[in-house]
Amino acid sequence: QGKLSNINGLAVLSQALDAEIPQVGTTTFRPPYTPVTIGALAGEARGVIFQPLRQTPMHAWHEANAAYFEPVGLWRRPYCYPRKGESHGQAVQREVLNTREKLGLLDASTLGKIIVKGPDAGRFLDMLYTNMMSNLGIGKCRYGLMCNEQGFLSDDGVVARIDEDTWLCHTTSGGADRIHGWMEDWLQCEWWDWKVYTANVTEQYAQAAVVGPNARKLLEKIGGLDVSKEALPFMQWTAGKLGGISARVFRISFSGELSYEIAVPASHGAALWEMLHREGAEFGAMAYGTEALHIMRAEKGFIMIGDETDGTIIPQDLGLSWAISKKKADFLGKRGQERKFLADPKRWKLVGLETLDSSVLPDGSLAVAAGSNANGQRNTEGRVTSTYYSPTLKRGIAMALVLDGPD
């Protein structure tokens, strides 16, 4: 309804009605004809606003150690820890190699943490996730996918069963509030008579990932918990005192390396972090940031919500059919995924790519095919979703959605 475009429309209308423009009438003039403030265009980029920036309990340590931060939702997370004379790229490569060869420490406190509790909690989670959660054993963990009603992937994370009627659901860092709201929406509007209670406890805990060949050595040195392969197998968790601090230790990995994630009360986060660095010095302990995290997960072939997904991707596109239960009668997104166009064999599927040299593919690059579509645009057969230089493989790597996928 801006004045500039409306005048042209009124001229066409007056001609059709064989009347003058004043006789046809005008509408109320609205932006962009009237002035628009620069602040309205800048949005959140104009400075500190009502929504406060979120910081982990280890934030002061990151600042003291020259971390370069990046925004993750409202969180500020270390992207890398450049040393004097290092570029960000060099710092990231150093962090990846040290984690692969020795010991890396990651502040994972921003990871979403939602408690789901009650007699119907298992039944509720079976509807929320594509796979079964009600049959998860106490003390065990399971990777789960969430889809919206249309069947498209919306979040993923590891679910741990705490006791008979309590589960801890981990979400993506930027998705905790959204997923908690999604849970409450279903409980309040659809399943209001189910006995389920949820609580977003993300900020109640600090979480540190201890990753690499020396990870177990560090925790054994600190003492207090048996973290041996026999006592704590992969995808299980245990609780107790770790170096005198009450902790939950999860044996999960987002890098392919031996890895433990340690959750402690937020007030003990800084103490835990400093203890890990102090006791881990002899094992080559070094903090790493989000970019090193992303590279290592891509080297392993793990997806990341927001990179490999864009609101139009279903689990089957990413080779995650194994995470969809065939036992359940229903779950959110099941009927959506049964639509015919989602079973089209021409849908792009996820693959891993390696460059033949050390070059890195531009993010979002398209695989261009011969011919053009009805709009005159070149046909495409795929696009790059994530791309990095891998110091482990010493070449560019990428993940992409392409026609025919792995086939």
Where do the PLM segments sit?
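Glycine-rich, Trp-frequent "lid" loop and neighboring beta-strands that shape
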Residues: 158-159
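Conserved, structured C-terminal
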Residues: 2-6, 39-71, 77-79, 83, ...
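Acidic, proline/glycine-enriched N-terminal capping motif
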Residues: 12-147, 152-154
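C-terminal, active-site-flanking charged/polar segments
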Residues: 1-21, 407
